[in-house]
């Protein structure tokens, strides 16, 4: 039995659909398309600009950009894809953990 049939009829401005039958909205892929458009627009927004080439040929410069594959939510641009092994590994790269916390308080000074 349909419970909507007991309500008084009120004129509505939208399209009329049967209230007792389950009507499913057609599945659309809009969120996926919106996500792709957003990623493309963000990628297009970051255009590399060489401020000081330091005597190097600007055509030979290589630009690294942040990708979501290597995420770091605390400081996303600090650890820019530092490989820990493989062909791109370099010994002079600092791979140690960084402390981004608030420094601890000196409790002896606060007790007085």
Curated annotation (Swiss-Prot):
Keywords: Cell projection, Cilium, Cytoplasm, Cytoskeleton, Flagellum. It is found in: Cytoplasm, Cytoskeleton, Flagellum axoneme. Its main location: cytoplasm. PANTHER family: RIKEN CDNA 1700001C19 GENE (PTHR35444:SF1). The lineage of its organism: Eukaryota, Metazoa, Chordata, Craniata, Vertebrata. Belongs to the CIMIP3-like family. This is Ciliary microtubule inner protein 3. It comes from Homo sapiens. Residues 1-34 are annotated as: Disordered.
């Amino acid at each position: 039995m349909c419970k909507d049939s007991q309500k008084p009829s009120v004129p509505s401005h939208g399209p009329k659909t049967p209230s007792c039958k389950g009507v499913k909205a057609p599945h659309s892929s809009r969120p996926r398309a919106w996500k792709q458009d957003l990623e493309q627009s963000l990628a297009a927004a970051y255009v590399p600009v060489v401020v000081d080439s330091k005597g190097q040929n600007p055509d030979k410069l290589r630009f690294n950009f942040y990708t979501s594959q290597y995420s770091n939510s605390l400081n996303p641009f600090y650890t820019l894809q530092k490989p820990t092994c493989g062909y791109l590994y370099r010994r002079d790269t600092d791979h140690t953990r960084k402390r981004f916390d608030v420094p601890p308080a000196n409790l002896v000074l606060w007790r007085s």
